[in-house]
Swiss-Prot record:
Intracellular or extracellular location(s): Cytoplasm; Nucleus
Organism field: Homo sapiens (Human)
Key words of the record: Cytoplasm, Nucleus, Transcription, Transcription regulation, Ubl conjugation pathway
Domain annotation COMM: ranges: 130-199
Similarity comment: Belongs to the COMM domain-containing protein 4 family.
Tissue: Ubiquitous.
Any single GO CC term annotated in Swiss-Prot or TrEMBL for this entry: cytoplasm
PANTHER family the record matches: COMM DOMAIN-CONTAINING PROTEIN 4, COMM DOMAIN-CONTAINING PROTEIN 4-8 FAMILY MEMBER
Record carries keyword Transmembrane: no
Record's protein name: COMM domain-containing protein 4
Gene: COMMD4
């Protein structure tokens, strides 16, 4: 069976297995747990002590707690990525075996944060490194008594790339012929146009 929150694919087996774990909690505690997971997804950090308190009644082992956080993170982020509305998500979770009141609690939480979550995921997705700075130089030899032939101009690029926000930038240097530089520039402009059309 295909589910919209899974991108119109089958639900992963590990998610199916953890649905029964979610059902062991009360719907109120599930909602509070969802709030914590949403904070983490929005980059605000997660309070593990609070999570342990919320799952204490259900007598979860540490593996169950981690699995519960992972499955909620998957469900909420996946639903946001695929623009699934709360009602559809609730229906799909019930089809997977989550009790109706649990699904309603989870979806209420999801609907409250759906828009900021989608915005945050959009900012974070498809981003591998951050460009911190660019330097360039063109070497062009007009003539030389030492060379038999004059070489074509060379473009030397130096990119300062940070792996993540707040990390120090690492230099990446490269040298390109004028032709290769023109191809690189054209492809970068094409990529920029495509990305800006996506919003």
């Amino acid at each position: 069976m295909r589910f919209r929150f899974c991108g119109d694919l089958d639900c992963p087996d590990w998610v199916l297995a953890e649905i029964s774990t979610l059902a062991k909690m009360s719907s109120v505690k599930l909602r509070l747990l969802c709030s914590q997971v949403l904070k983490e997804l929005l980059g605000q950090g997660i309070d593990y002590e609070k999570i342990l308190k919320l799952t204490a009644d259900a007598k979860f082992e540490s593996g169950d707690v981690k699995a519960t956080v992972a499955v909620l993170s998957f469900i909420l982020s996946s639903a946001a990525k695929h623009s699934v509305d709360g009602e559809s998500l609730s229906s799909e979770l019930q089809q997977l075996g989550l009790p109706k009141e649990h699904a309603a609690s989870l979806c209420r939480c999801y609907e409250e944060k759906q828009s900021p979550l989608q915005k945050h995921l959009r900012v974070c997705s498809l981003r591998m490194n951050r460009l911190a700075g660019v330097g360039w130089r063109v070497d062009y030899t007009l003539s030389s008594s030492l060379l038999q032939s004059v070489e074509e101009p060379m473009v030397h690029l130096r990119l300062e790339v940070a792996a993540a926000p707040g990390t120090p930038a690492q230099p990446v240097a490269m040298s390109l012929s004028a032709d290769k530089f023109q191809v690189l520039l054209a492809e970068l402009k094409q990529a920029q146009t495509l990305m800006s059309s996506l919003g």
